[in-house]
């Protein structure tokens, strides 16, 4: 194998791995609010394949820099709400609050079919803390659900057009609104990094150059 062919093979393998990594993780911004301005990224939700086959991991991060200061103590997320694909309801008992494990903070619990407030409506699941257990980072794992994928948890309730995720975030400065907490929601996909697109474009050009070279021989 010549150097050109080997380079093309390495590039193809690298792009495949990058594509696989991207396929195994999806991220969304919560950029809507009933208290602060819409269109600002207030929190980021990442859903990914777990380390254990079949598990799905959630990471929910409050983007602290988006909030008016000074921040209180404690500041952070107090609830987080999300949905699942209703196809997972079969077989009966396939999915429920008991499938959500390894919650951190560990004082939080899971409730079902709760209203997120702020006009954002009901969600299938809500991870819930309290005023003293607010957090800037929530993580948990969904385990033991047959047939789910990361996409099973990125949709509106019952497949509708509502927001995918919602959170109650509290403890920021009152600012001009007079409030120190609000409801936040969103389903805006985080853009794929430009480097991935550039790499993919480069690989396509490399493949075209190789074909032209072969045709000229």
Report the location of each language-model feature.
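Sec/Tat signal peptide C-region and signal peptidase I cleavage site
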Residues: 19-23
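Mature extracellular "passenger" or substrate-interacting domains of secreted, surface-exposed proteins
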Residues: 24-189
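A short, hydrophobic C-terminal helix/tail in secreted or cell-surface proteins
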Residues: 191-209
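C-terminal membrane-anchoring or membrane-association module
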Residues: 207-217
